[in-house]
Regions:
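S-adenosylmethionine
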Residues: 3-211
Length: 211
């Protein structure tokens, strides 16, 4: 229904799931001054428009989508948003990591996943799920983080998220980032009434949103 409203097409608002909006809590907790921020897997652009509204004045937001055919969607949404401090690019994470070492203060990685969080909205997606696909997505998530890690400034913030529930793509990949790349997992302030679930494996601060 909202897609018929002129204000939506004018960029006055963008509709997201509550779990996607949790990005705001991480930014507010750790970003206090202008930064260079990369939204690595940006399509369709909801997180980029949210970041554009959240980042302190004077920040630069780079919105990247690896798949060229999908990159036009965030470009359109960001153009509607009307922020001049946002750039849309179409590059592989490895290319960015090699070309822009230690450039970004913040990198947001909402990595491609097996999509278990979509089952309640799209019943057809259950037929695409398999154990092999979970393993493939978990491996791809690690590769994406490994490839982009060099672009993160020492002491910078990397936000890792998925729209799936299994521990292989979530807790195990976070554990990989900590153990193999030397990251520190930081807590994000929450409230009890939000009913957020913690980690199912390991003891790292993890935030799960179940329907």
């Amino acid at each position: 229904v909202y897609k018929r409203q002129p204000l939506f097409h004018a960029g006055a608002y963008y509709v997201q799931e509550a779990s996607s909006m949790f990005l705001e809590q991480a930014i507010k907790a750790y970003v206090k001054e202008p930064v260079r921020c990369l939204d690595l897997c940006a399509a369709p652009g909801g997180k980029s428009t949210h970041l554009a509204s959240l980042l302190p004045d004077g920040s630069l937001l780079v919105s990247n989508e690896v798949i060229r055919s999908r990159s036009y969607v965030p470009a359109e949404n960001i153009a509607k948003w009307g922020r001049p401090d946002t750039i849309v690019i179409n590059n592989d994470p490895e290319e960015i990591g090699e070309a822009l070492p230690h450039l970004f203060d913040v990198i947001v990685t909402d990595v491609p996943c097996s999509g278990e969080g979509m089952f309640r909205k799209d019943t057809d997606s259950t037929g695409e799920w398999s154990v092999d696909n979970v393993r493939l997505c978990a491996s791809r998530g690690r590769r994406i983080i490994h490839d982009i890690w060099n672009a993160l400034k020492p002491g910078g913030i990397l936000i890792y998220s998925t729209c799936t529930y299994n521990t292989e793509e979530d807790e195990e990949n976070i554990h990989y980032i900590i153990e193999e790349l030397g990251a520190e997992a930081l807590p994000i302030p929450t409230q009890e009434e939000w009913q957020i679930t913690g980690a199912l494996r390991f003891e790292h601060p993890v935030y799960r949103f179940f329907p």
